[in-house]
Each structure stands twice: as C-alpha cells, then as structure tokens.
Amino acid sequence: MKMKRRTTFILALLLSILVITLLWQLNQNTSSIEPTVNGNIVQVRSFHLRSDSTHLKTSTKGSVFVKGEHGQFEQIQIVAEIEIDPLDWGGVAFYIPDHWQVSSITSSYQGNQLTLIPEDYISIWKTSGKDASWRTMVEVGRDRSYVPTGGGTGTVMINLIPEQISMSTSESIAIGIEVGSKEENGKRMMGTDSIEVPLSLKEGL
C-alpha cells in the first residue's frame, strides 16, 4: 500500500514538473519576440529643400536610410514629407543613382482628398542615355505639360534595391532632389532648387 502511494506521489510530482516546464517554455516563446529598431541601418542622412529661388511654397524634408551588412549596400529608403504650392507644376523630384532601381513606393500625397488617388500624382521616368547623371527619376506632383497639379501635402516613401547582388564599400553614391518651377523670359524650368544627398558605407551613421 505504501509503495502504491509513493508511486502515485512520484507520478503526480513528475506531472507537476512537466506542466510547470511547459508553461515556462510557453511564456518564454511569447515574450521572446522583441521589436528591432534600425535593423541593419548603417547610415542616416537628413535633407531639407525649399523652392527659395521662386515665389512658390514648395518644399520637401526627410531622411534617407541606408541598410547594409558585411560592407555591402542592401537597401535604401527615402522618407520625405512633401508640400507643393497650388501654382507649381514642377513639384518634387528624386533622382536615383545608376545601378539602383525602385522596388516600391508608398504615398499619402493628395490622399486626404477622397476624390483623388495618390498614385496618380507619382510618375517614374527612366533614361537609357550613357551620359546621363541619373538613370531613374521619381516625380511627385509634376506636370510635364506645365499645368499646375493643384498642390497639396503628404508623405512619400521610396524603397530602392541594387541591380547587382552587392555594392562595394568603396563606392559613394548620391540621391538627387529638386523642387519648384518657374517661367522666365519665355522659358519654363523645372527643378529650380536642388540638392544632393551623399551616401557612403565608409562614413557610417
């Protein structure tokens, strides 16, 4: 009889230990998920550009995030707040360096108006010219027929990936940005004000 009670007690103890172990492992699995902040971000560059050379109130500001690992460029993300003057037909343009391609674009520009579609105000242009400084252009709120698009505000996120599997650390690249438009002496001009945002893995954050 004593042997039977002892066996029952041991089995109950083992069962309790098993239940406690399972509950502990379950708790560990649910609490082990932690958010990653700036994973693989090796460089951040801020920018701010206004159409100061004109009477227009067009501007953009934001940051460029460079992701990389083992001395290679892996992804570039441009996050820009945009404001375009109602009378501006030049809008905002981002010039993408050679050997990079646009993988996705997310935009809220003009999205606060129910009758408008954000993607209608974004266009991507490419050039095959060998002497061109830039191969791809992402234009926001720009009308090449010189008609103002109505202006507006919003946020645009542009994701870039390299055409090649890896990019050398010795290679420095730049993102070109321009804003505004004007007509002077009968000539129309897009991109009245511009900057370049230099990027290099060597420089770090």
Predicted features along the sequence, with ranges:
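Extracellular/luminal low-complexity Ser/Thr/Pro-rich, glycosylation-prone repeat/linker regions
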Residues: 25, 31-55, 167, 178-205
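Short beta-strand elements of extracellular/lumenal beta-sandwich folds
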Residues: 67-88
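Short edge beta-strand/loop segments characteristic of extracellular beta-sandwich folds
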Residues: 79-83, 93, 161
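Low-complexity, intrinsically disordered segments enriched in Ser/Thr together with acidic residues
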Residues: 133-172, 180-184
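N-terminal Sec-pathway targeting helices
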Residues: 1-15
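Hydrophobic alpha-helical membrane-insertion segments, chiefly the h-region
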Residues: 16-26
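A surface/secretory-pathway sequence property marking extracellular, secreted
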Residues: 99-140
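Surface-exposed beta-strand/loop patches in extracellular or lumenal glycoproteins
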Residues: 87-99
